[in-house]
Amino acid sequence: MATTIQNNFRIRRNFGKINKIAEIPNLIAIQKSSYDKFLQADVPPEKREDTGLQGVFKSVFPIKDFNETSSLEFVSYHLEKPKYDVDECHQRGMTYSAPIKVVVRLVVWDKDEETGAQSIRDVKEQEVYFGEIPLMTENGTFIINGTERVVVSQLHRSPGAFFDHDKGKSHSSGKLLFNARIIPYRGSWIDFEFDHKDILYVRIDRRRKLPATVLLRALGGVPDTAKKTPIEFHGSAEEILKYYYDTETIRIEGKGKFEKDLNPDLLKGQRATRDIRDPKTNEIVVKKNRKFTESAIKKLVAAKMKSLPIEPEEVYTKISAEDVVDEQTGEVLLEVNEEVSEEKLEELRKRGIGEFKVLFIDNLNVLPSLRDTLMQDKISTPEEAIMEIYRRLRPGDPPTPETATNLFVNLFFNAERYDLSKVGRLKLNYKFGIEEPLDNTVVTKRDILEVVRFLIDLKNGTPNKDVDDIDHLGNRRVRAVGELLENQYRIGLVRMERAIKERMSLQEIETLMPHDLINAKPVTAVIKEFFGSSQLSQFMDQTNPLSEVTHKRRLSALGPGGLTRERAGFEVRDVHSTHYGRICPIETPEGPNIGLIASLSTYARVNEYGFVETPYRKVEKGRVTDEVSFYSALEEEKHIIAQANAPVDKKGVFTGNIVSCRKEGEYINARPDEVDLMDVSPNQLVSVAASLVPFLENDDANRALMGSNMQRQAVPLLRTRAPLVGTGIEGIVARDSGVCVVAKRDGVIQSVDAARIVVKADVPTSATDVANEVDIYNLIKYQRSNQNTCINQKPIVKPGERVKKGDVIADGPATEMGELALGQNVVVAFMPWQGYNFEDSILLSERFLKDDVFTSVHIEEFECVARDTKLGKEEITRDIPNVGEEALKDLDESGIIRIGAEVKPGDILVGKITPKGETQLSPEEKLLRAIFGEKAGDVRDSSLRVPPGVSGTVINAKVFSRKGVEKDERAKAIEEMEEAKLLKDQNDEIRIIQDSAFQKIRRLLLGKEVSGRLVDDKGNQLLKRGDVLDDALLDTVPQRYWGEIAVEGDVQDLVRKIVENFEEQKELVKLLFGEKIGRLKKGDELPPGVIKMVKVYVAIKRKLAVGDKMAGRHGNKGVVSRVLPEEDLPYLEDGRPVDIVLNPLGVPSRMNVGQILETHLGWAAKNVGWRLQEMIEKNFGPDQLRKKLKKAFEGVEGSDRLGQLIDELPAQELPKLATKLKEGMHVATPVFDGAHEDEMKALLGEGSATMQSILFDGRTGEPFDQDVTVGVMYMLKLHHLVDEKIHARSIGPYSLVTQQPLGGKAQFGGQRLGEMEVWAMEAYGAAYSLQEFLTVKSDDVVGRTRMYEAIVKGENTLESGLPESFNVLIKELQSLALDVELLETPEAKAAREQAEGELGGPLGTPRGAAAEKNTA
C-alpha cells in the first residue's frame, strides 16, 4: 500500500512553539536572480530593462568616430543554445557557455560644410558574433574549464555621501576634525575636510588640497545637471555666504544709535547688551547681559516689536553680507566678507547709508569657518577657480579656459565618466531631502552645496546632525554576481570601443561592414580573466550539500574595490546591530578573515539596490497580522520591532503589558500599542549552517561558530542517516542545494532503477492532443566532486507511487529521505576511559568499521595525455618496454585499465610510451623504421601509475581523441554504451507517449459499431462491418491498424488526428536524441599538441581510522585515539554497548551545553524506536501498537490527520510504519525555540528523573562508580582524514639550488629537520644520527651517492662530505662582497681526489634538475 506509507517522506515531531508564518526564500536565489537580471535571456529584446548586459551595451554604444561622420549603434542582443550541456562540460573540461550575438547598426553621415547640418548617407545593420558568455547552472554555479566555480557576492561601501571625523587623532589638542566624502560608483572622489584652524579644504581624487570655496566658486562656471530641481548659483562670494549663513539687517539711526531687525529664530541663546523694554508698558523684558529665553522672545513677538536697539560695540567685528555701495559715486564702501570696523561704520553714517546686511555668526552655534575659508582663498571668479582646479589635477600642464572647463565638467558632470548609480542618487536624496529622479546619476550643484552645509552643521554642533556609521548596513551594499559581471563587461566594452574608434578613422567607412569594426576578443578576455582568476570567483566548496549552499550565500568584504585583510580594523569585522536578520553573527571563518567573510541569514534577501533586507510581520494596534514585508536597515530605523518569541494569544494580540523590542539597534521595553513590526521567525537571526545546530541557544558563541563551520567539512558517508535531533530545516537545505532529484511535475512513477527514474506526468490535454508527458531523470552515479568526495544519487520512490511537483524522488550525497544527513546518530557516554579520551580524543567502537557506519567513498581522477613531441608521437598502448605481464594483467588491448580493477600504489593505469632520441631522424631512417617497425630501445615507459597512498577500485575511464584520429577499441566501447543508454531513454519516452495516445483512441472507439471491413497487409480480415468494438475485440487488432478502423460520425477523424499528433511527437523525440548521439560521435576538442587524453577514476573506500578528525554540531571536535572491540566498551544494563566514549571535561570550559541537551533528547527519541521494536518482536496486538504510534506522533504538524490515518491503517500495515521508526523518533527542535526539559522528560517516559544510566565496564563486567550521561549524539566525520595526510619518502626529488629534499606531500618531499629538532638531537647526544640527518640524508651530494652504493654493496660505512648548503652560504656571503674562501687540508684533498677517481668525475657540483630522482 505504497500510497499511505510513502518512502520518500520523513515525519518529524516538532518542538517549536512559534508558528511558521513565512516560508524560507530559496537559499540560492541571491545567485540565480542576480544572474537572470544581468542576462535577461528570457525577455524579448524590445522589453528589456536598461540594467545588466543591456545597460552596459546602452551606455557604451553608440560609438562615434573622432570626426563624428559615422556612428555604430546597438540594436539588440540574443543568446544562442550552448554547444555542450552541463554533463558534457564536466567530462570534457569545457566551459558551460552560450554564444552571444549582437545586432549593430553602422550609420554614416554627410555633413553640410556651410550649415554644419548632418544627413544620413548610409545605414548598414548586421548581426555580429560577440564571443561566449558563461551560463549559470540550475544550482547557481558556473562550469569553467570543467570545474564548478561560484562567484561570491561582495559587500562594499555604498556610493553616496559619508560624514566622519578623525576621532581626535590628527591634532595634539584632541580636537575633532570633521570630513565628508562623496563616493561615486565610478568616477572621481570628492573629499571635504577641516583643518585644526577650522578652514574647510577640498581634495579631488586624494590630490593636494584646495580651499573648499574654490570648488564652490567653480560650480558657478558650469551649467547645473539637475533635472527636477536646478538652482541658480553663479559662485560669487555673496551667494556662497548667503547659502550658508543667515543675515541680519543693521539700521543706522544716528550717531551711536543702531537697531537690528528682530528675528526670533536667531535671538535664542543670545545675550542682551542692554535692558530690553516693552515699548508699550516700558517694563524690562530682558535684563542686560541675560540670555533671550523662549518666554522672553514670545513676549517681544506679542508686543509686535519689529527691531531691537543695539550697542555700537555689537556691530563692530560683524561681517558684511554684501557690497555696500555709495549710490552717488558708485564707490564700494564696505566689501562683502569684510569686517565692520569703527571707522567703516562712521564712514557709512556720514555717507547717509541707512541700513546694511551682516552675517549672523555668534561663535557658539554658528562658527565663521566658511567665511574664514573665503578669506584664505584669493580667487574671485568661477573661471579662475576652474583654472586653479586644473592646475592641481594636471600639474605642469599649461591650462586654457576651454581645456580646464572640459576637465572640470568631465570630472563630475559627464555621465560617461562619472556615475553615482541609482543607489548613490537614492542615498543623496535620502540624506539631504532632495527630489532628484533616480536616473540622474551625476552630481548636481545642490548635492555639493548640501554636502558642505551638512559638514558645517556637524562642525557647528547642530542638533540631529551626526556622523555616519560606515559599518551600518544602510551604508554597505551587496554586489552580487550579475553586477560584478556587468562591471567586467563594461571594462571589456570600453577597451573594444577604443579599437573601434581607431578603425573607424583609419579605413574607408563606406566600404566597411559592422563586423569589420568589431573584434570581441577584449571582451571575452576580460570575462575569462574574471572567472578564471578573480578573487571573488572561487573553486566551489563541494564537500557536502551544506558547504555548497553556504558558499553561494557567502558575502565577502574582500576582493577588487573592497577591503584588504591587513587594512581592515576591528570595527569592520565586528557584529553590528543592523546585521540582525540580515547577516549571521555566528558563521564567519576563524583566523585572519574573521568578520570580513560573512553569511546571509536564512530569511534575508538582497533588494534591487543591493541592500540586504529581512522580513517582518506587520503589527496593528497591538495585534500581530500575517502580512509580511521586507525592510532594509535604513527602512527599519524608525520602527519598534518585537521579538519572534514575544507571547501572543490565538488572535495574535500581545498578552503582556510590556513587550521587549528593538529600536535603532537598542533594546527597549514598549507597550503593545507602540509596536509596529514583529520578527517572522526566531531563526531569521542566523545563517543556514547555524540554524542546523539544535539547542544553539545553549552554546557559547565561539563554539557555535566552530560548530557551524565544521558542518561544512563533513564528508558524505556511504550509509547516510538524517539526525534524530534536527532543527526542521534539514529538508529545505537538501532541496535547495540541488543535490537531490526533485519532481518537475505531478505524475506516476513508471520505472525505477539505480541510474534513472521514469515518471509519467499528469498533463491536462484535450481529447486529441498528444503531449510529451514523460520525465526521465538520469541520476548522477559516482561522480567526483571538487573536493574528491563522491556524488551519487539513489532513488527513494517505487514504481506506481504518485509524486507531486517538488517532491524529492532521489537522494543525493549526504541526504536521506530528502533531508540533509551529514553524519550518524551514535550512542555516546560522557566518561573518561583509560586516558584514551584525554584532550578531546575520541574512543570508538569497532562496530563502525564492521558495519561501515562512518565509511566514505572518495574519488580520485588521474589524467594521461599523449602529445605530439618533437621526437615523434607519444602512444597509449599495452606494449610497454621492460614491464612484465603481471603489471599489465588489468590493461585492455588499448592499454587502459579495465573498470573494476583493484589498484594499489605503483600500478599502471594507462600504458604510455614516449619516443626518446638523441638525434632527429633523417627521412631515410624514418622510412626504414616505418617498414621494419620500431626498435624497443627508442621509446621509454611514461605510463600513468597510481601515486603513493592511493588504493582503490577503478570505476570509470574516459577516452578523448582528436577529430580525425581513429578511435581505439576502448573509446568505441564507451561510445556504444553511451549510445545504448540514450536509445533506451528514447524508446521509453516513445513507448509512454504511444501508450497514452492509444489509451485515448481506445476510449473513443469502445462501444462504436464498425462501418467498414478492416484487413491487414496480407489481406486477412481483422474486423467485419457491424462488429461492435469492445476491449477484447480491440486487443485482437494490432495497434498500427487502429487509425484505419472505419466507424460512424467524426470519431474516425479524431482518431486520425491523435495518430498524426503521436507521429509528430515521436519525430520530435527522435530528433532530440539524434542530436545528442551526433555529439557523442564527433571528435573532442583537445588542447593544441594533444593527440589523445585518457581520464581514469579510482574510488577509494575510507573507513574510520585512528587519527581521523570527528566533531559534533556544537564545536565539540576531537581526533580518534583508539578503536575498541565492542566487547571491551562500557555497556548498558540491557547489554547494549555504547558507540563512543567522550571526555566530560570537554563540556564545562567550552560552555557548549547544547551537546548535552542534544544527547538527552536523542536518547529519548531513540527509546521510542526501541520500545516500538520490542512491541513488534513480542507480537503486541494491533491496538496497543496503534496507541503507541499515535502517542509517538503527538505534536507533529497535522497530527490529527495522522492519527486518523493510523486508525484507518489495516493491521498488517502497522508494523511497516513502526519499523520506519525503529532507528528512533525523528524530532525537530528549532533554534531559539527548542524543546524544554519537561518535554524531553515526558518523551523519555517515567522513571528517568536523573537522565543518567548505570554503565558496566566491558572488560570486568563491573558497574562504574557513578551514573553516566548516556545518549544519542549526531557525530560527523570531517574532511581531515589521516589517510590523506600520512606520507613517507625514501628517495625523491631534490631542490636545484640547495640540493635538499623538497617539502610537502604534493612534491613527494621529506620531513623538515629544523633548529629545535637539532637541539633535541644534541641534547640526547645522538651525534652520529644527527650527522647523518644533516649530510647524507639531506644535501651532501657526494655522500648520499656513496651511501647508496654502500647500501647496494651491503657495506655499513658512513662517510659524510661537504653539505651543499655550505656552498650556498659561501655564495651568499660572496654576494655581500665578503671574500670567503674554502681552504682544503692535504688529507682532505687526497680523499677527494681518490673519490673522484672512483666516481669518474669532479665532485661538489650540483647535478640534475629540481625533480632529479636519485635512483640507480
Swiss-Prot record:
PROSITE patterns: RNA_POL_BETA. Its EC number is 2.7.7.6. Residues 1388-1416 are annotated as: Disordered. It catalyses: RNA(n) + a ribonucleoside 5'-triphosphate = RNA(n+1) + diphosphate. One of its GO terms (biological process) is DNA-templated transcription. GO terms for cellular component: DNA-directed RNA polymerase complex. It comes from the Bacteria. Coiled coil: none annotated. GO terms for molecular function: DNA binding; DNA-directed RNA polymerase activity; ribonucleoside binding. Keywords: DNA-directed RNA polymerase, Nucleotidyltransferase, Transcription, Transferase. The keyword Transcription applies. The RNAP catalytic core consists of 2 alpha, 1 beta, 1 beta' and 1 omega subunit. When a sigma factor is associated with the core the holoenzyme is formed, which can initiate transcription. PANTHER family: DNA-DIRECTED RNA POLYMERASE I SUBUNIT 2. DNA-dependent RNA polymerase catalyzes the transcription of DNA into RNA using the four ribonucleoside triphosphates as substrates. Belongs to the RNA polymerase beta chain family. This is DNA-directed RNA polymerase subunit beta.
